[in-house]
Amino acid sequence: MVVRVELDAIDMKILRELQDDGRITNVELAERVGISAPPCLRRVRKLEEAGVIRGYRALLNASALGYDLVAFCMVGLKHQSDANLKAFAARTASWPLVREAWMVSGESDFLLQCVAENLASFQDFVIEELTATENVDTVRTMLTIRQVKDACQVEI
């Protein structure tokens, strides 16, 4: 479990700026939040060490790279012991098509977001990998029509 970190107004400004532009220089960041560069860098490092900032990455356009299909899979397991849940969660890490995997409550045990080149490659994954996985009982899929919101930022 993640421990909540006490953040002051400057920390919040730093986080807002970094969410908007993760490639900003420390000097520019310090200027925008109203402090000098050395304490700004110390604050950023502290936020990284505390796990508030998990990393920095480029947001890629999947369609531009040939991945035209986004689908969700709702997966139910036959047995939900802690070991079985952990085993399936670990298995999801080995599937390149799975972009995100969530353990959920309700009718399914896991929700997977998948990105594939096309319907055929997604079907191959579902049939040859997902449903063939030990302890998988049910798989329901939903193909997306269009994305209407893509907010990767946390509201702060």
UniProtKB/Swiss-Prot annotation:
SMART domains, per database record: HTH_ASNC
UniProt-listed PANTHER family: LEUCINE-RESPONSIVE REGULATORY PROTEIN, TRANSCRIPTIONAL REGULATOR AZLB
Taxonomic lineage: Bacteria, Pseudomonadati, Pseudomonadota, Alphaproteobacteria, Hyphomicrobiales
GO biological processes: response to amino acid
Gene: lrp
Entry superkingdom: Bacteria
Subunit-level organization: Homodimer.
Domain HTH asnC-type span(s) in chain numbering: 7-68
Keyword Transcription regulation: yes
Keywords, ordered alphabetically: Activator, DNA-binding, Transcription, Transcription regulation
Statement: the UniProt record of this protein carries the keyword DNA-binding: yes
DNA-binding residues: 26-45
PROSITE patterns reported for this sequence: HTH_ASNC_1, HTH_ASNC_2
GO cellular component: cytosol
Alphabetized InterPro entries for the sequence: ArsR-like_HTH, AsnC-type_HTH_dom, Dimeric_a/b-barrel, Tscrpt_reg_AsnC-like, Tscrpt_reg_AsnC/Lrp_C, Tscrpt_reg_HTH_AsnC-type_CS, WH-like_DNA-bd_sf, WH_DNA-bd_sf
Name of this chain's protein: Leucine-responsive regulatory protein
Role description: Mediates a global response to leucine. Exogenous leucine affects the expression of a number of different operons; lrp mediates this effect for at least some of these operons.
Pfam families: AsnC_trans_reg, HTH_24
GO molecular function: sequence-specific DNA binding
